[in-house]
From Swiss-Prot:
Gene behind this protein: cyd
Biological function: Cargo protein of a type 2A encapsulin nanocompartment involved in sulfur metabolism. Cysteine desulfurases mobilize the sulfur from L-cysteine to yield L-alanine, an essential step in sulfur metabolism for biosynthesis of a variety of sulfur-containing biomolecules.
Listed InterPro entries: Aminotrans_V_dom, Cys_dSase_SufS, PyrdxlP-dep_Trfase, PyrdxlP-dep_Trfase_major, PyrdxlP-dep_Trfase_small
The protein's name in its UniProt record: Probable cysteine desulfurase
Keyword Nucleotide-binding on entry: no
Family, similarity comment: Belongs to the class-V pyridoxal-phosphate-dependent aminotransferase family. Csd subfamily.
GO molecular function: cysteine desulfurase activity; pyridoxal phosphate binding
Subunit comment: Isolated from bacteria in a complex with encapsulin 2A (AC I3NID5), strongly suggesting it is found in a type 2A encapsulin nanocompartment. There are 1-2 copies of this protein in each encapsulin shell.
Keyword Cell membrane: yes
Keywords for this protein: Cell membrane, Encapsulin nanocompartment, Membrane, Pyridoxal phosphate, Transferase
UniProt record, GO biological process: cysteine metabolic process
Amino acid sequence: MTRSPCSTTSRWISSMSTSEYRAVDAESDLPISAAELAALASQLYAASIRPGPDSPPQQAPVAPRGSVPDATAATSAGRTAAGTADVYPGPVPQVGGRDVYLPPPASPAPEAPPQAAPPAPRGSAPDATAATSAGRAAAGTSDVYSSWVPQLGVADIYLGAPTPAGPEAPPQSAPPAPRGQVPDTTAAATAYGADLSAFAVPTGIVSTAPGVQAGTAPPVPVVPRAATAPSWLPEAPSVADLGWSDAPAPDAPAGDEHDYHFLTKTDPVPQFRDEHEVFDVAAIRSDFPILKETVNGKPLIWFDNAATTQKPQVVIDRLSHFYAHENSNIHRAAHELAARATDAYEEARDTVAEFIGAPSSDNIVFVRGTTEAINLVAHAWGAKHLQPGDEIVITHLEHHANIVPWQLISQKTGAILKVAPIDDAGNLLLSEFEGLLGPRTKLVAASHVSNALGTVMPVDKIVELGHRYGARVLIDGAQSIQHIPIDVAELGADFFVFSGHKIYGPTGIGALYGTEEALTETPPWQGGGHMIADVTLERSLYQGPPTKFEAGTGNIADAVGLTEALRYVQRLGVERIAAYEHALLEYATPRLADIPGVRLIGTAQEKASVLSFVLAGHEPLEVGKALNAEGIAVRAGHHCAQPALRRLGLEATVRPSFAFYNTFEEIDVFLRAVRRIAEGGANVG
């Protein structure tokens, strides 16, 4: 992955001699010499670190601050008693402000002298058991780490038991447990990997056509359809497909070919195996602290994922670590914290580019979210390239964020906004869409997934048709980025936009992907610091993409948090997430449709996550309040998609929407609550 060019200041920092800086932080007060320190680190490394089969030989990490305690109790009894999610398998040394993971050493042979315990984390801790159990239990949080070291486990990293040095060696202690109790591995594999019926896709799903006909669109067939997986899902999803054993590829270490800015670099640790041997929803849920909340005395059931997703602990920890250890402005200072923050921010850009398949990090512009990204294209690209009589084509399914900006720029430029229709099931009428395209079409903008109905749009065909008529094409990925594997190079769109908070990241951060050609022909839309190359009182010269679109101080911390969210999703696997969420949707759809008075809204063949409905005799807001009384969070309203709902003769719907941390049991609770409301047994109003 190529990295965006760095500022002169940051390059100067990178070129400074390492001899000008101590090998460890200034706070360190080690009672041994540097040579002894290196020897100790080498000994510990040789005794304890077990690289993966593809890992290159690693340089020994530097020992941490403080004395070396007895770590046996810390790694086994301490963490087990705490019941919290340590994100490393052993004590964490801190080297030059960077954390290094050091696993516990292998057991010695029967007659060998005891091995030295691993070094203690962050200062001296004479009683490691008390430090681990009492300290972390009181804090209720896991230790944080720097962005240089990849965190591979979603809860704790499971390590296989080390091979004993001799036949008489004592048994090994169990690997660290995640948040909560870990069942026996064999039982877990049987419970989650062998019983496929729990994840079976129901059959006989009935498409419920709305009772309102609009326009000349053909009606939805009322015959039942087969429950078939969308084309973007893996074939024949099952529990076996939801598990995996291959470890994720390790991050490439920073070399001379990259523009990393850290003054003190550490070698990456060996790659550990991810602990989730199967798609264990219970273990995944333990990574999301908010799911332990109660609402009105009931366990929280978060079915409002189309509005925003909840955040895993690793994202929360990463944000905290940034503000505790890296907080600074970026690209424009000659000190250590600026170097750390700059590197973390640019690493976030690299991560986004990799996640969506962009050819370069220079294709990624950080914005506040999808709405700002679309406005950037409309008011920067559109203001330059749209003339009176030119045409913009959108669809009837769009979120207001993909309607209003085009209305505004059309009013300013005299362009014409055209809208492609949908049928009563919520499908785009592709032939009608193509009929709107012509020689004056300059831009096509369409959602990948409808936020109101869940319809998966044929974006590959939309891009192909748009380009056939010479138009630029923008795809709104706000509702697809978290559910569907994205490859922008394969898709071929000129622009692709999404929000971080929709994919388990922080709010206030999102990304605009643009091809090199599209970004080059787009002028800056805001002026200020950072985006300039040179300024005089008479004129200004601008940087190239993506810098010219990022005036002022960006949302640095939340970009760094987005990095961790995307890595979390990558560890689980987007294809596995898609298969599991589709199973949830196919399970809920026929059971909800079977409740008297329920009418499903949006019954397209290919859907993702969203299950909109109305209930006869009840306003959607009443249903939403009644469900909230049961601890169930859904959206009730027009979902910022009034044209789509009005096309179907409605002003509002109830919209549950699913994510990979939701369960079939939660769906059952939801269905029972809706049935009670329908039968008059719930307090509505």
